[in-house]
Amino acid sequence: MAALQKSVSSFLMGTLATSCLLLLALLVQGGAAAPISSHCRLDKSNFQQPYITNRTFMLAKEASLADNNTDVRLIGEKLFHGVSMSERCYLMKQVLNFTLEEVLFPQSDRFQPYMQEVVPFLARLSNRLSTCHIEGDDLHIQRNVQKLKDTVKKLGESGEIKAIGELDLLFMSLRNACI
């Protein structure tokens, strides 16, 4: 019994020492609460479901038929400008969250029946990326996302339709960046 207590005590002391070292490491960084791991990953199987993939692309196609502004691209090279490959999933998480909250939820009564199936799927992806963070400064990413938001808002309802019409690009960009 004494040996078991000594073993448990040693384990607890080791855990305490490790915790103290971790706390010291954070203090040395100036107290920055940078995450240990980014959690910016999605399972490949999320993008291998033919039915929901088809519905996502059909929704995008239907909305793009209503999009009369062919001069503007929301999800393209400009969005990724200055963003490293390792930060792209975080960027796409930000775009996904904006698209859900500011575009899809308010427009949920349109483009049926696709919308009612695609929105919950994208919301699940957003939920799975909820712990996705990057270490350090994300100002360059926030700037790029803000430009996208400003473009959508400037275009009004036409911008929202354009964002829905680019759900296929959002889907592919999430897949490329997050798996």
Swiss-Prot record:
InterPro entries according to UniProt: 4_helix_cytokine-like_core (IPR009079), IL-10_CS (IPR020423), IL-22 (IPR020453)
Record localization: Secreted
Keyword Glycoprotein among record annotations: yes
Pfam families, A to Z: IL22
Keywords: Cytokine, Disulfide bond, Glycoprotein, Secreted, Signal
Cellular component, GO annotation: extracellular region; extracellular space
Disulfide cysteine pairs (residue numbers): C40-C132, C89-C178
Annotated glycosylation sites: N54, N68, N97
Taxonomic superkingdom: Eukaryota
GO molecular function (one): interleukin-22 receptor binding
Function: Cytokine that plays a critical role in modulating tissue responses during inflammation. Plays an essential role in the regeneration of epithelial cells to maintain barrier function after injury and for the prevention of further tissue damage. Unlike most of the cytokines, has no effect on immune cells. Signals through a heterodimeric receptor composed of two subunits, the specific receptor IL22RA1 which is present on non-immune cells in many organs and the shared subunit IL10RB.
Similarity comment text for this entry: Belongs to the IL-10 family.
Name of protein: Interleukin-22
Gene name, Swiss-Prot/TrEMBL: IL22
